[in-house]
Structures are given as C-alpha cells and as structure tokens.
Curated annotation (Swiss-Prot):
HAMAP family: Transcrip_reg_TACO1 (MF_00693)
Species of origin: Chromohalobacter salexigens (strain ATCC BAA-138 / DSM 3043 / CIP 106854 / NCIMB 13768 / 1H11)
Disulfide bridge positions per record: none
Compartment(s) where it occurs, according to its Swiss-Prot or TrEMBL record: Cytoplasm
Descriptive protein name: Probable transcriptional regulatory protein Csal_0810
GO cellular component entries: cytosol
Domain of life of the native organism: Bacteria
Keyword Cytoplasm assigned: yes
Family: Belongs to the TACO1 family.
Keywords: Cytoplasm, DNA-binding, Transcription, Transcription regulation
UniProt cross-references to Pfam families, sorted A to Z: TACO1_YebC_N, Transcrip_reg
Length: 240
C-alpha cells in the first residue's frame, strides 16, 4: 500500500503541475491578447476565442479575471512573442512559440533543451516555410456548401473546408482568423466551436524511429517544462 500511495501522490503532483502550467499559459496569453486588442471580448474576437478555449480546458474564472485585470491596468509585465525554429531528432522540424519578458533568458533555455536532445536550433525561417500558419475553426454541422458560401460572401480567403463525421472544419490563413469567425457568427449565429485556434500545420511529415523517438520525447518534455513556452509544433511521425 505504501508504494501505491506514493505512486498516487506522485500522480497527483504531476496532475497539479500540469494544471498549473495550463493556467499559467492561458493567463499569459489572455493578458497579452487583452493588452494589445482590448479587454472587452465583444470587441476583441481573438480574446473571446481564447477565453472560450480556456473555459473548455477548465481554467478557473479567477485566473481569467486576474489576467484581464492586469491587462486593463497601467504598466504590468511586458511580454513579447518569441518564436524559435530548429531540427529535432531524425531531422524532424520543430517550432517553439514563447511569451517572454526576457528574450535572452528564454533563448538560452530553449537552446539548452535542443542541445540536451541532440537537436539543433536554427535561424528564423529555417523550418517555418514548411508549415502553414492557419486559423482553424471546427463545429458541428454537415452543410459544407452553406459554410463555404457564407465565407465567400464575407470575402474570407478560405484555404480548405473539411466535412467529416458531422463536423465542419474551416482552415484559413492566420491573418483571417477574426474575419472568418465573424463571418460564421453572422451567418449561423453563436456556434459552439470544438476547435478555435491558430496553429502551424506541417506540410509534410518526417518519420522518427529507433533511439530518436526517446530523444524526441525528451525534447518535448524539457521544452514543456519551461514556463515561457506556449506552443510546440512539429512534423515528427513517430515510428514503432
């Protein structure tokens, strides 16, 4: 029982750490989004989508409110986006997005993670050209033509629309996020989005096999342990 109890304690600690990371991630993103685009979700669609995602991930209201309160005040932390690109184990491509108040510290931390996993940090643009920077919105529905028509009438530059298993997924350039979401709201009212985010989607996948799999996992774990890291995108396809 002693060992089982210890395992349970460790599992609870890991869960608590994971929740803390999620709360911190959303708190920082909400703060930056509200600081740049306004604290009113009605006039800041990116913020509204971010808050909706946070609630779906069970982020407590007090975490969201605290971030908004900080953003509405004068001064506060000065976070900026830092994006790093590099090559992971098996020559897979990796993009790491951070929000940081100290770019030099964050760069050093991210580089150390790459080095420990026998990976190499590249220069800006070294791998991002192999990814599509997309706005992705998914919701329950089946009338693909009606969705496409609504988006075209709103002059949205649609990249693709998927209709699968009763779910419509719209892909558009990341710069069209707010326009796409507004067009859908105008045409279909308030939608419950299953996916509502901006991502880097790999154009091609790279197989990662053998010892490289463990090294790749190590890279992801160490990067995710960094407070400044918000998102990690890659094109690794793990084998075996």
């Amino acid at each position: 029982m002693g060992r089982a109890f210890q395992n349970r304690k460790e599992s609870m600690a890991k869960t608590a750490d994971a929740k803390t990371k999620v709360y911190s991630k959303y708190g920082r993103e909400i703060y930056v989004c509200a600081k740049s685009g306004g604290v009113d979700p009605a006039g800041n669609l990116a913020l509204r989508g971010l808050i909706d995602r946070a609630k779906k991930d069970q982020v407590p209201s007090h975490v969201i409110d605290k971030a908004l309160d900080k953003a509405s005040g004068v001064g506060g932390e000065d976070y900026e986006l830092a994006r790093y690109e590099g090559f992971g184990p098996g020559s897979c491509m990796v993009i790491v997005e951070c929000l940081t108040d100290n770019p030099n510290r964050t760069f050093g931390d991210v580089r150390a993670c790459f080095n420990k996993a026998k990976s190499k940090l590249g220069t800006p643009g070294s791998v991002s050209h192999m990814f599509d920077h997309c706005a992705i919105l998914a919701f329950a529905g089946s009338d693909e033509e009606a969705v496409l028509e609504a988006l075209m009438e709103a002059d949205v530059d649609v990249t693709d629309i998927e209709n699968e298993a009763g779910r419509i997924t719209v892909f558009a350039p990341h710069t069209e996020y707010a326009k796409t979401k507004q067009a859908l709201a105008d045409a279909f009212g308030e939608l419950d989005f299953e996916v509502d985010e901006i991502q880097f989607l790999a154009q091609t996948m790279t197989p990662v096999a053998g010892d490289d799999v463990a090294m790749f996992d190590k890279l992801l774990v160490t990067l995710n342990d960094l407070d400044d890291v918000q998102n990690i995108y890659h094109n690794a396809e793990l084998q075996g």
